[in-house]
Design a protein with these regions (language model features):
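Domain-level signal for soluble alpha/beta catalytic cores
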Residues: 1-395
Length: 395
């Protein structure tokens, strides 16, 4: 993984805006109306273009924009997750939407995930979440959410091979030495219905074992693997009633263990982990504090950790690193521009945010990044302006 003592390197969290042509092609493909060869050709060209634009914006460690993860609408908060439904065998479409699953309430000694409709922030601000004009948004209503009904297996070999080929060709065409590709973590992949495995923990480990094939393919291709597992922090909001920090940490550890099981034998210096509290536009008053989970995050077998630090709910948590020892062989990717606002950060603010972390962990151990993916969350014109200001502020 690249590091530099001469300058602050830049990257981002993964998702970037798709061109209208790719969004429409994805929509038509989902309806079975696209010639597959023509689609793959257009996808490859789009990946080449998005890498070129990242380099032009000043991004040192680019990604493929998650273009291989289908997004059939301009506003989309779930492509990073829902892509896995087409790459895992053992799932069955239910006809239910994301918010239609039954409520599961926790009790002392029995902490469980409830439904998405029973999330505490949503219940606290029910009027705002229910008002289309409020500015609160979780994206288009997701339908046809799957349930696991048979042993899980990884079936996405052709898809990940195509993603890798497209990205490596784009990196070579733009003379870029290193790039990253995202893959969903087991804690998040398992947040669907389970009618097959005997326990939630067994299901999480099954997801880990299946997704390991994708992790290994990315690393074996010479790319940086980024594990996207917002559930490690975000699940806190989906447990009702609110658990104590210690109860939540205990609930989360099997998900950490499952991920480490999936990463076994893979070089840590080729892996980065992305933590966030969910990228929807909402109040986020029920987010767990970073200080309560930072040590849990650091138990993940990765060489770098990406996390939100550039929005009004979590920016103050830079101070957590005053008392948290970052292992000597690790680096961090703090978010210093955010998906959570249409306001484009001033380069001087970006520089201030970077400087805070540099004063605590050292310049050579920071890669300046975004809070979360920008694609599907802010307008494309704004997203690219944010990447440019990120590079300017980190310079």
């Amino acid at each position: 993984m690249q590091a530099s003592s001469d300058r602050i390197l830049t990257s981002h969290a993964g998702s970037l805006p798709r061109p209208d042509s790719l969004i429409e092609a994805n929509h038509q493909r989902e309806a079975g109306k696209v010639d597959e060869a023509a689609f793959q050709k257009s996808l490859s060209a789009a990946v080449g273009d998005v890498v070129r634009r990242q380099v032009a914006a000043g991004i040192a460690v680019p990604g493929d924009g998650e273009y291989g993860k289908s997004m059939g609408s301009k506003v989309n908060y779930r492509a990073w997750w829902s892509y896995s439904f087409t790459r895992l065998g053992g799932l069955k479409v239910t006809g239910l939407g994301l918010y239609d699953f039954p409520v599961r309430r926790s009790s002392p000694g029995n902490v469980v995930l409830s439904s998405f409709g029973d999330r505490r922030d949503r219940l606290r601000f029910a009027e705002a979440y229910g008002d289309r004009d409020s500015g609160v948004s979780t994206g288009p209503r997701a339908t046809d959410w799957p349930v696991c009904v048979a042993p899980l297996s990884y079936t996405g070999h052709a898809a990940i091979a195509a993603d890798i080929a497209n990205f490596k060709a784009a990196l070579a065409a733009n003379n870029v030495a290193e790039g990253f590709m995202t893959s969903i973590g087991p804690g998040s992949a398992s947040r669907i219905g389970n009618d097959h495995y005997k326990s939630d923990e067994e299901f999480v480990f099954a997801c880990a074992e299946a997704m390991r094939e994708e992790y290994k393919a990315i690393v074996d291709a010479g790319l940086i693997l980024q594990i996207d597992d917002p559930a490690i922090a975000e699940n806190f909001d989906q447990i009702n009633p609110e658990p104590t920090a210690e109860e939540y940490r205990k609930f989360t550890m099997p998900r950490i263990e499952a991920l480490n099981h999936a990463l076994r034998g893979l070089p840590k210096d080729r892996i980065r982990f992305h933590l966030c509290w969910g990228s929807w536009h909402g109040p986020h008053t029920t987010d767990i504090a970073m200080r309560d989970i930072v040590d849990v995050m650091l138990r993940i077998d990765a060489g770098a950790y990406s996390f939100e630090a550039g929005n009004v709910r979590h920016e103050h948590e830079w101070s957590v690193w005053k008392d948290t020892k970052l292992p000597d062989d690790k680096v961090i990717l703090p978010g210093v521009v955010s998906h959570a606002t249409n306001v484009v950060e001033h380069p001087e603010l970006v520089a201030e945010r970077v400087g805070r972390f540099a004063s605590l962990v050292g310049r050579e151990r920071i890669i300046a990044s975004t809070d979360c993916g920008l694609g599907g969350r802010v307008h494309p014109q704004i997203a690219w302006a944010k990447l440019e200001t990120l590079a300017q502020g980190a310079a």
